[in-house]
Amino acid sequence: MKTKLQYYLPKMLITKFFGWLAEKKAGIITYWIILFFIKIYKINLKEIKTKDIKSYNTFNDFFSRRIKIDCRRIDYDPSIIICPADGIITNFGYIENTEKLQLKNHNYTLKSLLAQNETMIDIFQHGIFFTTYLSPKNYHRIHMPCDGSLIKMIYVPGQLFSVNLKFYKNISNIFSKNERVICLFKTNFGYMIQILVGSIISGTISTSWYGKINYKRDGIIKLWKYNINSNNKPIFLKKGDEMGFFTLGSTVITLFSKKNILIKENLSNYKEVRVGDVLAYGIQNVK
């Protein structure tokens, strides 16, 4: 019943309202809302960089909080690929072809997930993927799994279905339907994509080099190029560098273009992970 209700809810209106509310500077009200949130979701205050709750002017300021550098261990061994976010690994595996990519118990096509971009479909049709779900309790900044140079970024408008673990199984192709930002990088392991998937109540999707991507929500696909022939400044990020963040829970899908990456042996579905945890081991200098 709750799943069917999502099809009829004014999801965009709800998201805009909560996004507006989360950006309001409401003084003591904001302070008490944050305290309530901390209690409900058992937020670990020991790892927060700014512990003074009163210093957060809005709820979003707290939600997108930074943590202390030493709270997440990054292994800088160049052959190691790390988890980009705190959350739960809901699925991972090898992409057999363009027609078979299973995410959260649903079969997707690369064509639908990558917004019909034929170039990227060709690159990733024999690749590897990891899906990380971020719940409201998690640290919500997204980091780089390995060193990479940004090639392009695509904003894909879409629905705002909840990606909560209680609902995703009953909504087919949810990641292809939902709003998302696709970031393509060139790495020493070949090409990599980080897909930041939106969700109901998720106010914004932001990247470290651009800021808020979906603030207009005008229903138009947008493309930014960052290669040497574009007008945009080249972007290079190191492993562990912040590359983006959500306001409220959502999902990150990480794709690699080659099958010369070995998934960590004891990695399992529905395993809790943190930024810096080892996902896989790779062979470098892929052409």
UniProtKB/Swiss-Prot annotation:
Modified-residue entries (Pyruvic acid (Ser)), positions: S250
Broadest EC class assigned to this enzyme: lyase
GO biological process: phosphatidylethanolamine biosynthetic process
Keyword terms, alphabetized: Cell membrane, Decarboxylase, Lipid biosynthesis, Lipid metabolism, Lyase, Membrane, Phospholipid biosynthesis, Phospholipid metabolism, Pyruvate, Zymogen
Catalytically driven reaction(s): a 1,2-diacyl-sn-glycero-3-phospho-L-serine + H(+) = a 1,2-diacyl-sn-glycero-3-phosphoethanolamine + CO2
Cofactor binding notes: Binds 1 pyruvoyl group covalently per subunit.
Membrane topology: Peripheral membrane protein
PTM description: Is synthesized initially as an inactive proenzyme. Formation of the active enzyme involves a self-maturation process in which the active site pyruvoyl group is generated from an internal serine residue via an autocatalytic post-translational modification. Two non-identical subunits are generated from the proenzyme in this reaction, and the pyruvate is formed at the N-terminus of the alpha chain, which is derived from the carboxyl end of the proenzyme.
Coarse class of the protein's main subcellular location: membrane
Entry's EC annotation: 4.1.1.65
Pathway where this protein functions: Phospholipid metabolism; phosphatidylethanolamine biosynthesis; phosphatidylethanolamine from CDP-diacylglycerol: step 2/2
Short name of one Pfam family: PS_Dcarbxylase
Single GO MF descriptor: phosphatidylserine decarboxylase activity
Name the UniProt record assigns to this protein: Phosphatidylserine decarboxylase proenzyme
